[in-house]
Each structure stands twice: as structure tokens, then as C-alpha cells.
Curated annotation (Swiss-Prot):
Gene3D superfamilies: Ribonuclease Z/Hydroxyacylglutathione hydrolase-like. Keywords: PQQ biosynthesis, Transport. Pathway: Cofactor biosynthesis; pyrroloquinoline quinone biosynthesis. It comes from the Bacteria. This is Coenzyme PQQ synthesis protein B. Pfam families: Lactamase_B_2. GO terms for biological process: pyrroloquinoline quinone biosynthetic process.
């Protein structure tokens, strides 16, 4: 199983276009030990030619240009993208679909009923794409409750089994499900390659660690999970907003019950954080917070990172 990190930043990327926080300002001035990040998305493959995308960020065109493997060049119009799995309906995870409108056939998009509802009403991307390539929607089935959904395969991606996992996070501000949780608003994905018997749990939007989530985290070979904020009040400390991390659907890394303490007892998985907000001090590779992560055996994803399982 091959995983390529197309983008590792949270909404707005890093530096964010209108932000002059401690991180963004220093990066622009060139006195920051760290790198820019586009908005989060990953691609997975088992053969290096055919790929499934997980989320489609607004930065997708640049991300694809920096990833030659996804353009095999077999015909005048070609792509290695065989399908797109949406984990939620957030703007920074879905608007990249519009950049793929020149596709010569319908986009095969896999998402839950809740996400489909948002993308045909409040943020009607699917409706817009009806006038271009159109969308072939593949519903992801989730039972009511906390159990993972039905496993599935993306057509054209041989040997990769995907299982949707309901997560407690937050629907986007435009959604009627904002602060009104419905199963399927946000999912994680369990990726498994039967040939290698390796697995990865991908959850860039993770607000709570429920029992069924922890169970998967304990047995995964690799965790690629929410690293948005360092502290619960990070945005308030930066003078940006009074919204808390968990209010926005993200479990912070530090503090009691934070991601670091959750990951501490897990000795087997490769632990990687993704979806890093521009305000997070871990972006600074010389920061005390980054050193704390490294001491805990936790890595930080970067654009262009490859994970081979």
C-alpha cells in the first residue's frame, strides 16, 4: 500500500493568505525552521499507477502537478485518479472537485448520505458539476451507532479494502448538522492491503476518541490523524477567535486527554499527525512543542510525504 500526502495543512494552508500570526509572519520573512503546507488530502494506491484520493482540497491542481505518478500520460486526456472518497463536507476538503471538472467521464465520488446532502444543498458542488463532467455518487453505508460501516473497494484500485468509521467531529458552518451531530457527518477510513496485511487509519477530523476509534488505533500499523491544534484555546491565544479546538471538531494534542496522552500507550503504530493549522507551534521544527512530539514518537506529516506499508 502506497500513501502519498498531497497536502498536510488545515483549512487555509500554511501560511494562510491573510494571516500574520507568529508562524505565518516568520515563514514569509524567511526566519522560520519549517515548510509551507497546502490543505490536506492524501492519495493511496497498490500499484503506483491507479490512485484513490481522500478529500479534494482547493489546492488540488498544484498538488497534482507536484505528484507526477498520478498523471501516467497514456492518452491525450488521462489521469491516474480512479475515485475520490470524501470524509466530510468541509469546504477545504471538497471544493477541489470543481478543479477536476474537465474529467472526460463522471467523477466517481464515495461519501455518506450526510455529506451528499450538504453537497447538493448548502454547498451544491454536485449540482454545479452536473453541467460539466457530472458525479457518479457511491453511497457509503454506516449503521446507526458507533460501529464501522460496510467495507468497500474503489473500482480500479485492486487489493485495497476501505472501511468507513463514524467519528465525532463537526459538520461545516453552512451545514444544518453544525453542532447537531448525525452519523456520517464525518468519517475516518480504515485502509487495509490484504496482500501485505498492513493497515492505516486515516482521520484528519477527530474531535473525540470513542471506544470504537481507540480499538482501531490500537491495531493499526499506521495512524494518520488529526493534528490541527496544539491547545484547546490556541485560536483565542493567537487573538483570532474565541472558538475552542473541540468546538471546531478537533482534539488538541496537549493537555489532559489530548492526542499525545491518547497515543502514549500505543506502542505498535507508526504515529503521524496531519491537518496542521497555521497557528500550531509544531510547525516550527525548532519549537519545544515539536521536540515534545518527537520525544513521544509522533511525526508530523508534510506535503509530498510517502508512506509505504
Amino acid at each position: 500500500m502506497l500513501i502519498h500526502v498531497l497536502g498536510s495543512g488545515a483549512g487555509g494552508g500554511f501560511p494562510q493568505w491573510n494571516c500574520n500570526c507568529h508562524n505565518c509572519n516568520r515563514l514569509r520573512k524567511g526566519n522560520f525552521k519549517g515548510q509551507a503546507r497546502t490543505q490536506s488530502s492524501i492519495a493511496a494506491s497498490t500499484n503506483g499507477t491507479d490512485w484513490v484520493l481522500f478529500n479534494a482540497s482547493p489546492d488540488i491542481l498544484g498538488q497534482l502537478q507536484h505528484f507526477p505518478a498520478i498523471q501516467p500520460g497514456r492518452a491525450l486526456r488521462d489521469t491516474g485518479i480512479r475515485g475520490i472518497v470524501l470524509l466530510d463536507s468541509q469546504i477545504d476538503h471538497t471544493t477541489g472537485l470543481l478543479m477536476l471538472r474537465e474529467h472526460h467521464r463522471p467523477l466517481d465520488v464515495y461519501c455518506t448520505e450526510s455529506v451528499h446532502q450538504d453537497l447538493t444543498t448548502g454547498n451544491p458542488l454536485f449540482k454545479v458539476l452536473e453541467h460539466y463532467c457530472t458525479v457518479n455518487w457511491h453511497p457509503l453505508q454506516l449503521p446507526q451507532g458507533d460501529a464501522p460501516g460496510e467495507g468497500f473497494q474503489v473500482e480500479g484500485i485492486e487489493g485495497l479494502r476501505l472501511t468507513p468509521v463514524p467519528l465525532r467531529s463537526e459538520a461545516p458552518p453552512y451545514s444544518p448538522h453544525r453542532h447537531n451531530y448525525h452519523v456520517g457527518d464525518t468519517i475516518g477510513l480504515w485502509l487495509e492491503d490484504p496482500a501485505t496485511q498492513k493497515s492505516l487509519f486515516y482521520a484528519p477530523g477527530l474531535g473525540q476518541i470513542e471506544d470504537h476509534v481507540l480499538s482501531l488505533m490500537e491495531k493499526a500499523d499506521c495512524l494518520l490523524i488529526d493534528g490541527t491544534f496544539w491547545t484547546e484555546d490556541e485560536m483565542e491565544r493567537a487573538g483570532i477567535t474565541q472558538k475552542r479546538a473541540t468546538e471546531m471538531g478537533h482534539l488538541p494534542q496537549s493537555g489532559q486527554g489530548g492526542m499525545i496522552s491518547v497515543l502514549a500507550p500505543l506502542t505498535s503504530p507508526w504515529k503521524i499527525l496531519i491537518h496542521i493549522n497555521n497557528t500550531n507551534p509544531i510547525l516550527d521544527e525548532e519549537s519545544l512543542e515539536r521536540a515534545q512530539l518527537e520525544a513521544a514518537g509522533i511525526e508530523v506529516a508534510f506535503d509530498g510525504m510517502d508512506i509505504i506499508l
